[in-house]
Amino acid sequence: MDFATNDEIKYAHDTLLKDYPDFDDEKQAIIRSNKSADIKACPGSGKTTTLLAKLVILANRMPLPANKGICVLTHTNVAIDEIKSKLSHQANVLFNYPNYFGTIQGFVDKYLTIPYFNSVSDVPIASIDSERASIIFENAFSKKGFEDLTCIWGQIKDRIPKTLTGKDKRNKVRREQIEFLFGSYYSADKNSFYREYGANRAIASDVGKPIFQLLDATRCQPLRSGVLKFEDAFSYGMAYINRCANLRDAFSERFSYLFIDEMQDTNELQYDLLEKIFDKDKVIIQRFGDPFQNIFEHGKMKWNPDSKAFPINFSNRFGESIASVLRTVCEKNNASLKGNVAIESHKPILLVFDNPLNVLPKFASLVSELKIGDKTILEIANEEKEKDGLHRNRIKAVGWVGKDKKDGLLRLTSYYPSYEAKPSNGVLYKHSLFEYIRKSPSYPTNWILRL
């Protein structure tokens, strides 16, 4: 049986997109689907709006049979705010019990991490904040002397260039020590340490070994203060669900539907934990995402939509002049991507420069001067900002690396010296921009603008 009738689909469309064309066949197929499925969407495809259409329809059916709820998970509070702004009065129904709308982190914190940690720890949770945890860690690390740290030399020595000497070598060793210790994955379930989640072998599991004692005294020091890294929250959540099997039944009885937006940003640990929380035989699980936009290092995205996934290949964000470039520079085969022929997009421009300080001023002048039709890009962006319920700015300059590692490579501060990087647990691709551009069938000389 279909999830929605024609009348319900029309109602959802008129609620969300009254002055825009009807949902196309790809989107209607997704809205009608009432089974667990993956939705594989291209940039600007309207996948979130397609999800919202299902939520509008469900809002009119509340309460659901047996008073079950809807669980909607995404990765940022901005995404939740966007959902609220677009759902309007339906949000009052959907954002209350028995439903749950929020981030994956917030869901795990509320239902798993906080209750479990508080039950097994001598101190209650004070904060789930990687930055705060790093401050406590570094204080504990600073008290360790040379002899304390010799036990991890074998783990980091290959990362120290043999050409380094003196202060440069000492600084590099210190950075690698910190990265090794604080960056390790602590399994609360096994009371063991791993280089990263998913590693086959523990780097420390014997409490009598110096390396375990060092990790326990530094990496776990924040935990003794009730301060968890974001990753720790998932570790304790995993321990709870492994030790309390009936939790899976409880969550699967509570919710009829689980919708996950931006599934491509779900890391391996989050993915595995969600698989343990929800029973696919009892909950309809639909996962929306774009595998070509994942934020993780190559090979780290566990979500892999198969050939049965619902596609949305048509983009409403850009025209064919941009789509044709994205099809060629994408790391994976993205031949199915289609631009909107009704949208006039400016051809891509690649800035080539000698002085990085010239880049942002040139970028600003381009968006202020270049026209699409009779309007500049800036004018178009300002119009879109007014239409957006959250009034977000659509013009952004995005950098590859924020932190200054003193390695001579360009990063955000090279272009904008007053920028201050915020701590992040994400891992970026290590390829260069040139490697992606080189994949284009023809060298893109018509994109290049030398400063």
Annotate the PLM regions.
Residues 272-344:
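Conserved RecA-like helicase ATPase core segment
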Residues 176-228:
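Conserved helicase NTPase catalytic core signature
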Residues 1-119, 249:
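P-loop NTPase Walker
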Residues 4, 8-46, 206-300, 314:
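Conserved helicase NTPase motor core
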Residues 313-424:
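Helicase P-loop NTPase motor core
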Residues 422-451:
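Long, charge-rich alpha-helical interaction segments
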Residues 68-69, 81-180:
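Conserved P-loop NTPase-based nucleic-acid remodeling module centered on helicase motor cores
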Residues 55, 74-77, 104-105, 288-292, ...:
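A short beta-strand-to-loop transition that corresponds to the Sensor-1 phosphate-sensing loop
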